[in-house]
Every structure is written in structure tokens, then in C-alpha cells.
């Protein structure tokens, strides 16, 4: 018996099987709605910034002098 999951967009039951063309979505419409949400940044994967902007102040960099050279 195949696994049944809910479509992340409309919550319609979707059979998780090779013949389910749009899994985990129920249709191309729901798949495209999800893609649009990612493209418009409604969804995002949380990440911690690699740069500490406060740490840059420790160097007391003079940007004007740097860009004149």
C-alpha cells in the first residue's frame, strides 16, 4: 500500500508513488504556486550570516582612503 501525503498547498491527499507526477503536490498548479512562493521569498531557509558587520568596525577602515588608491 503506497504512502499518502497531503499536498503542501491545498492539503489534498496525494499518493506517494511513481505514477504521481507532481508529488508531493497534487497538481502542476500547486507545484507552481509553491515555486512562486520561493521565488518571491515568501519561503526561505534560515541561515546565520557568515559576516559580523560589527567586527569590521574593529579595524577602523577608512573606506575613502582605500578607494582613492
UniProtKB/Swiss-Prot annotation:
The keyword Zinc applies. Transmembrane segments: none annotated. The lineage of its organism: Bacteria, Pseudomonadati, Pseudomonadota, Gammaproteobacteria, Alteromonadales. This is DNA gyrase inhibitor YacG. Inhibits all the catalytic activities of DNA gyrase by preventing its interaction with DNA. Acts by binding directly to the C-terminal domain of GyrB, which probably disrupts DNA binding by the gyrase. Its cofactor is Zn(2+). It holds the Pfam family YacG. Zn(2+) binds at residues 7, 10, 26, 30. Gene3D superfamilies: Erythroid Transcription Factor GATA-1, subunit A.
Amino acid at each position: 500500500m503506497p504512502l499518502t501525503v497531503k499536498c503542501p498547498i491545498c492539503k489534498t491527499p496525494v499518493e506517494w508513488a511513481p505514477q504521481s507526477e507532481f508529488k508531493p503536490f497534487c497538481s502542476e498548479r500547486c507545484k507552481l504556486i509553491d515555486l512562486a512562493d520561493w521565488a518571491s521569498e515568501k519561503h526561505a531557509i534560515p541561515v546565520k550570516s557568515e559576516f559580523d558587520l560589527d567586527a569590521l568596525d574593529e579595524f577602523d577602515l577608512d573606506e575613502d582612503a582605500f578607494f582613492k588608491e
